[in-house]
Amino acid sequence: MIIVPSLLNSNIYDVQENVKITKDAGDNYLHIDVMDGSFVPMQSFGGKLVTDLKKKTNLVLDVHLMINNPELHIEEYRDADIITVHQESTKQLYNCLNQIKKLGKKAGVAINPGTPVHMLTDVFDLVDQVLVMTVNPGMLGESFIKSTLKKIVELKQI
């Protein structure tokens, strides 16, 4: 299992310091939540931050796109190492994951707490990682949804 620290709670002015803390702690990955204010209610970082971070760090940049129609924006995140899209955010999940792979990146898919694992069956051959949301996405301070643990167990058995 890999535990990846997230930048979501970072103030934009503290990003550089938080990256340093992550490196000093010995972590190799950095999770960057991208939110559009439409798929989820909040807004956050964009592709420019990912490009700027890639120039300044050798951390693996794991970008989580919580945006509608991610297939229209994947190119903006070409400097990420891993790009994860939500199953619920696109009608073209297979094409979206192929687009990520064509950039030479690892492809991930996220599922919301209410989405069953079997919804991913057709794309398992393209997926390098699955992100099981254990909270409703897009809001800070959400309560952990215990029933999502069953999905993690189910995925480990596949």
PLM features: what roles do these ranges have?
Residues 36-37, 135-139:
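A short, flexible beta-alpha/helix-coil linker loop
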Residues 1-80, 88-92, 99-107, 117-127, ...:
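Conserved N-terminal beta1-alpha1 strand-loop-helix module at the mouth
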